[in-house]
């Protein structure tokens, strides 16, 4: 139902945010920003 849709959206957003943070960390560590 609606709850499962909301949960799916939150999980997708969380993955995107985590991915962005990981990319920024890799960038800073490698010094290639």
UniProtKB/Swiss-Prot annotation:
It holds the Pfam family Antimicrobial_2. It comes from the Eukaryota. Its main location: secreted. It is found in: Secreted. Antimicrobial peptide. This is Brevinin-2CDYb. The keyword Transmembrane does not apply.
